Amino acid sequence: MNRIILILLFFIIKVNSQEIAINKDSNNLTLDGNVEFADKNLIEAEKFYRKSISKDSLNIKASYNLANSFYRSELKQEAINQYKSSIEKTKSKETRHKSFHNLGNIYMQNEDYQNAVNSFKNALLNNPTDDETRYNYALAK
């Protein structure tokens, strides 16, 4: 009986340590992407973010940052899709707010005012104190 418990304990520890290693690799790739993004090497940043997401599909920072990279590269449809993905993955009100806010900005640039209004409204639901989002919401209306 003790032997079975030890085997199960060993198995749980092994699986947990592998998961930690994967998360660490994914986070390191995200950090590398952030460096490239800051240096305006958007293609390289995109590569690192994609690698990070491939290691950990629930890495919300990499998903959100990939959307920002697309947005900065003016790949609007890709940015829209990636922001929507980061919204679906996260429970963080801050990330949801920023994603919806940026979606609203893209829709405004595309003159899609109805989607812009909806995006800014959702951003305000996640952060009602943001004056910039409130201003953009009024402008889109």
Identify the residue ranges that each predicted region occupies.
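Short, charge-rich amphipathic alpha-helical segments embedded
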Residues: 47-75, 127-130
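Residue signature of alpha-solenoid helical repeat architecture, marking inter-repeat boundaries
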Residues: 23-24, 57, 94, 135
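Bacterial Sec-dependent N-terminal signal peptides
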Residues: 1-31
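Feature detects intrinsically disordered, low-complexity acidic/polar segments
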Residues: 70-141
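Structural signature of alpha-solenoid helical repeat scaffolds
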Residues: 20-21, 54, 91, 125
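Alpha-helical segment of the N-proximal tetratricopeptide repeat
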Residues: 22-51, 55
